[in-house]
From Swiss-Prot:
GO cellular component: plasma membrane
Signal peptide start-end: 1-28
Lineage: Bacteria, Bacillati, Actinomycetota, Actinomycetes, Mycobacteriales
Gene that specifies this protein: ctaC
Name of the molecule in the record: Cytochrome c oxidase subunit 2
Basic and acidic residues: bias regions: 176-191
Positions bound to Cu cation A1: 246, 287, 291, 298
Database matches in SUPFAM superfamilies: Cupredoxins (SSF49503), Cytochrome c oxidase subunit II-like, transmembrane region (SSF81464)
N-palmitoyl cysteine: lipidated positions: 29
Length: 362
């Protein structure tokens, strides 16, 4: 009788685990994560996202941890229950055999213990693919397209396309600098002979894959590049590297994408889109791919402003081509320099330790 009760308890525990995980699976990964201290604890250090894609990834991250903890508690509970219920010392006191009843040929139990892990793995795989597809989808109809070029050890940002309502010209804006782009195209092949080089026979100095724009923001050792973007607007990023591999990473996007040289030859998807940035402010961006001596200092800033301010900013840049990015930021009432990170002198000849230029952040 006692053995039957124990077997019934184990079966109920297993059934409870199946029902519990099934409920989580049906809930889906896009259910909002818990808020407050509990949500912060379950986030395990992840920042709160500022895009819908980031929110989906954050929710998935949190619910995976919730599922893992539930499974862990169930398994720990069964382990502790078995440890105390079927101990040799307890069996000896009760005058029973040292070993409990063996269940190695309990077909229903073995089926449950095989099927449940398969369901868990399949559910996690399903929600992983679901979240990944949402994050990498190229279906946002971007109103702003930004060309991003990484190089040792800084960034260049250019506005390739801007929709009419945000454009400095009042109509759809195409920002390609045709003259510089044509010059880059000429570097594709060496002049006056065959090209015995490994990149499909192209010149080692080929820069034709890079994009050049009329309105650009270029980072220097004295000034962090500030990329100005509108809030609540679909944005597309087009990435490339001018030298070694880099990676474009904004922690609040909860997403990073590698920037390669010759991305097409490397079979890389160089573009990604976000539906909108939901919060205005300054957000630090970083290189997330080890790229040499000053990799850790290769920062930039995303400055998110209202669509109205963004249109004013672009108009100022378009009407004043000689003005600096800091001048344009001042013109719309924004801090002229990066506020989320500071410049670092990345010149290889710097050896005196004077790596911080306090005048640039003033």
């Amino acid at each position: 009788m006692e053995q039957q009760e124990k077997r019934g308890t184990v079966r109920k525990a297993l059934l409870g685990s199946v029902i519990g995980f099934g409920g989580l699976a049906l809930a889906g990964c896009d259910v909002e994560a818990p808020g407050g201290p509990l949500g912060t604890a379950l986030g395990f250090g992840w920042p709160k996202g500022i895009t819908p894609e980031a929110t989906s990834m954050y929710n998935f991250w949190v619910w995976v941890w919730v599922t893992a903890w539930i499974i862990g508690f169930i398994m720990w509970g069964l382990f502790i229950y078995g440890m105390f219920s079927w101990s040799a010392k307890r069996a000896k006191k009760a005058g029973k055999d040292e070993f409990p009843r063996q269940t190695q040929y309990n077909i229903p139990l073995e089926l449950v213990l095989t099927i449940v892990p398969i369901i868990i793995v399949m559910a996690l795989f399903f929600f992983t693919v679901q979240t990944q597809d949402k994050v990498t989808a190229m279906d946002k109809d971007p109103k702003v397209t930004v060309d991003v070029t990484g190089y040792q050890w800084n960034w260049k940002f250019g506005y390739a396309k801007v929709a009419g309502e945000l454009s400095p010209t009042g109509s759809d804006y195409v920002g390609t600098d045709e003259k510089r782009q044509e010059a880059a195209e000429k570097t594709k092949f060496d002049q006056g002979g065959d090209n015995p080089n490994p990149i499909n026979g192209r010149s080692k100095t080929d820069t034709s894959y890079l994009h050049f724009n009329k309105i650009e923001t270029l980072g220097t050792s004295e000034e962090i590049p500030v990329l100005v973007l509108p809030s609540n607007t679909p944005v597309e990023f087009d990435l490339a590297s001018a030298d070694v591999s880099h990676a474009f990473w904004v922690p609040e996007f909860l997403f990073k994408r590698d920037a390669y040289n010759h991305p097409e030859q490397n079979k890389q998807q160089r573009r990604f889109q976000i539906e909108k940035i939901e919060k205005e402010g300054a957000f630090v961006g970083r290189c997330a791919e080890m790229c040499g001596t000053y990799h850790a200092m290769m920062n930039f800033e995303i400055r998110v402003v209202s669509p109205e301010k963004f249109a004013q900013y672009l108009k100022f840049r378009n009407d004043n081509p000689q003005a600096t990015n800091s001048d344009a930021l001042k013109s719309i009432g924004e801090a002229p320099y990066a506020t989320s990170t500071h410049p670092f002198n990345s010149e290889r000849a710097t050896r005196d330790g004077a790596n911080f230029d306090d005048t640039a952040a003033a």
